[in-house]
Structures are given as structure tokens and as C-alpha cells.
Design a protein with these regions (language model features):
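Alpha-helical interface subdomain recognition
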Residues: 1-98, 265-411
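Short clusters of hydrophobic/aromatic residues that line enzyme substrate/ligand-binding pockets
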Residues: 23, 106, 186, 223-225, ...
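Glycine-rich flavin
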Residues: 45-224
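Interfacial loop-to-helix transition and helix-capping segments at the boundaries
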Residues: 102, 230-232
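Short secondary-structure junctions
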Residues: 169-172, 221-230, 246-252
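Short coil/turn motifs at beta-sheet boundaries
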Residues: 197, 233-235
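A short, charged helix-loop
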Residues: 236-266
Length: 411
């Protein structure tokens, strides 16, 4: 599958220009293809069966999505075998994976790991990702915070709390300079890494002087990936332990910090699109149900109290769409406003997804609380996604700091 950049998003936007947040024809075509695949290969019964069995990623589905549809290479330039598309197209796929609660490492490999590698220019790994031959994951906890808006996207302004400056739990030994490769031995444990179980390559930020980003073969001796209990069983987390494992350096110093910061920022922005997809699916399911469910000889959706609740959800979902689309447009254009747009989108979409999923469960009545109904999958996806890569309150606190407002309580 190939796609082309829309003329309104290619390159950096001129100062003051307003991006077109509408979906282009190419984006809608991409959506239709991805939705058809997920509806066919990952319907609710299949997802529920996978969760019941305690299985992690659906690798056959991921291979089809990554290699056959080319979604793994959307962000990768054509010179490395990718589609040369933008974050706008990547956001469309994220929306659909959220809508289906798909058990695929799209966010962690095709977005976060790819964004980090684009910052290093490693053609070999980028080519492997674009072809679908390799899957990668950034060895950072899924709760890691992207750079704050006042960092200017560098990742260097907040040290270990927010951004890419560290400290990181993996320590890098002195590189072996005998063959000029710079390979270093890595030791440490990273907790709660998303996408680690499916990854062939781990991108490991190594704390040291200088700070470096390393590529590690996930199958190498000394690498242990232990699944951990996660609220969202459709996106399994793992603790990754490295015991004297060789790591090939990809970037050093500020280049490495920028690569990791780019991965976290892109991940948060595309997770906002995924959360919007969850919210929109929950709203659609609920509206359909209250139209069909009758009580007192009339559809329950005709009751004013339910109308008001669903109207509130619709407003939240619509706002989340606008914020997520703006963040995707800023990422696509390399806009200086990207950190602000991503923080706004992550906060808005996280809240909207949780609200929509909660109302989906409650307004479905008794059936909404059963294991056989998919509402609980969407609720867990919504809640875990809202906590990943910065909670809504943490992102709002970062935005408040820009205008010297106090953060929300508890931040």
C-alpha cells in the first residue's frame, strides 16, 4: 500500500497558518482498508478469546497490518522502503486500532520506535521496520512523560521527571573501541514497557556519560522480558531486564535525547488519536443500543436524562477529535507548537475516552457489565491509555505552567 502526502501538510507550516483538520480522501481510503481488515480479523469475539487465553499480541494480524497494508512504514521515507506519509495518516490507523481494541504493537513499533529511529537515521533498522520484517519497541516505561511544552521539545529541560534527559534505569558500560563499533554492555531493568514482548529489537536509552540510545537484539542472551499484570489485556506490558547485554549505539548526547523525546512526543500524540477512536466507538455503540432497547413501550434513548448524558459524551468526543487532529497536523508539519498540541490532545482525548467508556458500560445496563460484552475491553483500554505517557492532569499541569497557573491538586 502506498500513500501520498497532502499538499496542506507537507513540510513545515508557515507561521500563523491554520491546518486543515478534515480527513483527506486518501486518509479516508486508508481508514476503510484498515477498518475492513480489523473487522474481519479482529472482531470482538476474537479479541475476547485472546484475552481469555492470556495471549499477548496478535502477530499474524500485525504482520498483515504491517507488511501487507504497509502501516508499519507509514512514517518511514520511501528511500528506506516506507510509504513516506505523515503523522496525519498514522493517526488514522491509530484511531482504527483504538476503535477495535486491536492486539497489535502499532503504537509502540510503527510510531514510537520509528520516531526514535528517524532521529538517528539508522537505515538498516528503518528498512526492517518498513518491510514488516522487524518489530521494535522503545525500552521506556509506558508511563514515561514526553517533554513539557516549555522544554521546546528538546527533552532536556526537566531531567528525569519529564523528557529524555534521564536518569534512565539502564546503565551503559564503557564502549568497546577496539573494532570502532562502540558497542557497550548494558545492565538494568525497565518496568512496564509496552510492545516489548512482540519486539525483535529494543531501543534502549542508556544512562551514562554521554547519554546514548542503543539498539539491542531482543533475543540476545541476557535479555529477559517478563509479562506483568496490566489493566488493559489487549496491550500487554513487560519488565525488561538487561544483564551484560551488548548494545549498538544509535545516537549520542543531544542527538540521543532528541530521538527519545521525539518518540515520547509522537507516542503521546498518536495515543490521543487512539483514545479518540476508543471514545468514538463507545459513543456509537451506546447510541445504537439506546435506540434499540425499549422500556415502558419506548426506546430508552428517548428519555431526556439519557439524551443529556450522551450529549455530554458527544461534546467531549468532538473536542477530542479536534485536539487529536491538531496534534497530528503539528507532528506532520514539524510545528513548534507540537508539544503544546500534544499535551492538549492527550488530556482531552484521555478524559473523553474514559467518559465515553464509562457511559457505554452504564447505559448498556446489565449486559454492559458482563464479560461477554466488549464494553469492558474499551473501558480498560480507555483508562490505561489515559494513564500512559502522561495522565490528563499531568499534561494540564504542564500547560498551566506556561501561563504561571498552579497545577491541578496532586500534581
Amino acid at each position: 500500500m502506498t500513500t501520498t502526502k497532502d499538499s496542506t501538510t507537507e513540510g513545515t507550516r508557515s507561521a500563523g497558518a491554520i491546518p486543515d483538520l478534515r480527513y483527506s480522501e486518501a486518509e479516508e481510503q486508508l481508514r476503510a482498508v484498515v477498518r475492513d481488515l480489523l473487522d474481519d480479523r479482529s472482531p470482538w469475539p476474537a479479541v475476547l478469546a485472546r484475552v481469555d487465553a492470556g495471549e499477548a499480541d496478535d502477530l499474524p494480524l500485525w504482520h498483515t497490518l504491517a507488511a501487507d497494508l504497509g502501516c508499519a512504514g507509514l512514517l518511514i521515507p520511501e528511500s528506506h522502503g516506507g510509504a513516506g506519509a505523515s503523522y496525519r495518516e498514522a493517526a488514522v490507523v491509530a484511531e482504527e486500532t483504538g476503535r477495535a481494541a486491536a492486539c497489535v504493537p502499532y503504537l509502540t513499533s510503527a510510531v514510537m520506535a520509528t520516531a526514535a529511529l528517524l532521529g538517528t537515521g539508522d537505515g538498516e533498522l528503518l528498512g526492517g521496520l518498513a518491510s514488516g520484517r522487524l518489530t521494535a519497541a522503545l525500552a521506556a516505561g509506558f508511563g514515561s512523560l514526553p517533554p513539557a511544552p516549555d522544554d521546546g521539545g528538546s527533552g532536556a529541560g526537566r531531567g528525569g521527571e519529564r523528557g529524555a534527559g534521564g536518569p534512565w534505569p539502564v546503565r551503559a558500560g564503557r564502549p568497546d573501541e577496539r573494532d570502532g563499533s562502540g558497542v557497550a554492555r548494558l545492565n538494568g531493568t525497565v518496568r512496564g514497557v509496552a510492545g516489548a514482548l512482540a519486539a525483535d529489537v529494543l531501543l534502549v536509552p542508556g544512562d551514562g556519560v554521554p547519554f546514548r540510545l542503543y539498539a539491542v537484539d531482543a533475543a540476545a542472551a541476557g535479555v529477559r522480558r517478563v509479562p506483568v499484570v496490566s489493566l488493559d489485556a489487549t496491550r500487554q506490558l513487560a519488565d525488561v531486564t538487561l544483564d551484560n547485554v551488548p548494545g549498538r549505539p544509535l545516537a549520542t548526547g543531544e542527538d540521543a535525547a532528541r530521538a527519545v523525546a521525539a518518540a515520547l512526543t509522537a507516542g503521546a500524540g498518536m495515543l490521543a488519536s487512539e483514545q479518540f477512536g476508543v471514545a468514538e466507538r463507545c459513543l456509537g455503540m451506546t447510541v445504537t443500543y439506546v435506540k434499540e432497547r425499549h422500556q415502558f413501550a419506548r426506546p430508552v434513548g428517548s428519555f431526556q436524562a439519557l439524551k443529556h448524558r450522551l450529549a455530554d459524551v458527544w461534546v467531549a468526543v468532538t473536542q477530542a477529535r479536534a485536539a487529536a487532529r491538531y496534534a497530528a497536523a503539528c507532528l506532520a508539519a514539524g510545528d513548534p507548537d507540537t508539544p503544546v498540541a500534544v499535551a492538549l490532545a492527550k488530556a482531552a482525548a484521555g478524559d473523553a475516552a474514559v467518559l465515553a467508556a464509562q457511559e457505554c458500560v452504564q447505559l448498556h445496563g446489565g449486559i454492559g457489565f458482563t464479560w461477554e460484552h466488549p464494553a469492558h475491553l474499551l473501558l480498560k483500554r480507555a483508562k490505561s491509555g489515559s494513564m500512559a505517557l502522561g495522565t490528563p492532569d499531568r499534561h494540564r499541569a504542564a500547560l498551566a505552567a506556561l501561563v504561571d497557573l498552579p497545577p491541578p491538586p496532586g500534581n
